[in-house]
Amino acid sequence: MLPINRQQHILKWLKEEGSLRISDISARFGVSEMTVYRDVNQLVQSNQVIKTAGGITLPVRTPQTDHMCSYCLKPVNQAHSVQLITVNQDIEQLCCAHCAFLRYADKTEEVSHLICRDFLLQTTVSAGSAYFVVNAELNLHCCQPQAIPFATLDHAERFQKGFGGAVCTFDQALEDMLQDRKKRCTCTKK
């Protein structure tokens, strides 16, 4: 079984049981505890689980965390925020499209919708149908490299003429963010 499949099973079990011991996970999968620790560490790094003494649990959501990015833990600025809606109808707030792309990549199978705001008009738009200007010279003072969403290709191209960058579809921007994740990502994600 691949690590991503084990991680999905771990998250499913956590939702059903609340907490799990590393030794129990190891026994269920028939793998070493070291293998489980590697899987769990990836979930901890993406803020999907919290380590406890000898085990793991799901993070507790508080009203304060609703105003913090679920990826990098920065405060969410409503003008640039993105909402990730899961198939279970859970809503995660993200500070910008950059973090939304990275969070989406971490949990693609669980995502139902990504909702963002058009940069110029501040209207709500599905990220899947939006156009993004990636690496524009205008600094939004959020995570880098930045991806700025637009509802129309025309607006994205006009913005690009003034501020540079590359106009991308959702899939192209996602690929760019994932390639730059290790090189230029400025997220303070722990």
Swiss-Prot record:
Main subcellular location of this protein, as a coarse class: cytoplasm
HTH deoR-type domain sequence ranges: 3-58
SMART domains named in the record: HTH_DEOR
InterPro entries per record: DeoR_HTH (IPR001034), N2O_reductase_NosL (IPR008719), WH-like_DNA-bd_sf (IPR036388), WH_DNA-bd_sf (IPR036390)
Chain residues forming the annotated DNA-binding region: 20-39
Subcellular location: Cytoplasm
Listed Pfam families: HTH_DeoR (PF08220), NosL (PF05573)
Inducing factors: Significantly induced under copper-limiting conditions.
UniProt entry tagged with the keyword DNA-binding: yes
GO molecular function: DNA binding; DNA-binding transcription factor activity; metal ion binding
Keyword Transcription regulation: yes
Effect of disrupting the coding gene: Cells lacking this gene show little or no difference in growth under copper deprivation, whereas possessing enhanced growth under copper excess conditions. Possesses a high intracellular content of copper.
Keyword line: Copper, Cytoplasm, DNA-binding, Metal-binding, Repressor, Transcription, Transcription regulation
A GO cellular component entry from the record: cytoplasm
Functional description taken from the UniProt entry: May act as a negative transcriptional regulator of cutJ/ycnJ in the presence of copper. May use copper as a corepressor.
Protein name as annotated: HTH-type transcriptional repressor CutR
